[in-house]
Amino acid sequence: MTGIRALLARFDRYQQSHAALGFPFAVVKKFGDDGAGNLAAVIAWSAMLAVFPLLLLLVTVLGIVLRNDPSLHHRILNSALVEFPVIGQQLQENINSLNRSGVGLIVGLIGTFLGTRGVANALQNALNTMWEIPRERQPGFPWNAMRSLAIVLVLGIGLIVTATLSGFGGGTGAIGAGLRIAAVALAFALNVVVFSVVFRLATAEVAWKDLWLGAFLTALGWEALLTFGGYLIAHDVKNMSAVYGTFALVLGLMSWLYLQAELTLYAVEVDVVRVRHRWPRSMTSTAGVTAATGEGTERA
């Protein structure tokens, strides 16, 4: 037992003195200290309630704006449905049944506002917790409500614009391959900007320059999850369908949203650990005192 402890202590000192190991470990430890898994679950549940009103709003707005170009409307809409890989096929099969009238726009606006406001509130709580902003220094009413509204607007506009750019990039029309690549790259860059703005709005006392890496990692991770995570979860949904039936789709979508939320919070923790200098962290100390330097750190 003493030999195992000595080996663990040696590895602990090694990871603290090497950033390639020490920094990722500090991020994971900070994630656990903050209870970020629970925070991600709240965000995912709120997002679940916002998905379908947001989809209705997207379909209605695109139907109004692109009513004279059915081909472009169809291409953009299908590219937007890729954002829902678990239920994308079902949505594509039944998308024409959605109401594209003024009533659909009103219902979509109300449902989207209520649902995404829950996501915005949960995101504010999560990021302020992770950045260790005391509650007395967090914005109260009505400023927190105004921030939530701004987050909703940024996310909504960002979704529509990136869906449009992805539609151009994924098309096979008259535009050349260079323009399609440029459209996809621009959509990714816009996602980075959107996440930067959302993170800044959701956090009370953090500078713009401290958020760029987390925003970039979030955009990159979201694209990776859209490509690989959706496939894996769709595979699990097929296995769950025999037991849960139709509810397997709901469980699959919930799992995918949770993965997205968890990935986002991990990306935020990268910024927190980097900016707040929350590493190196000891593997054995719960007080945040590093074995390698003897310097004290805060709880996180």
Predicted regions and their residues:
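Membrane-embedded alpha-helices and immediately adjacent juxtamembrane helical segments
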Residues: 1-300
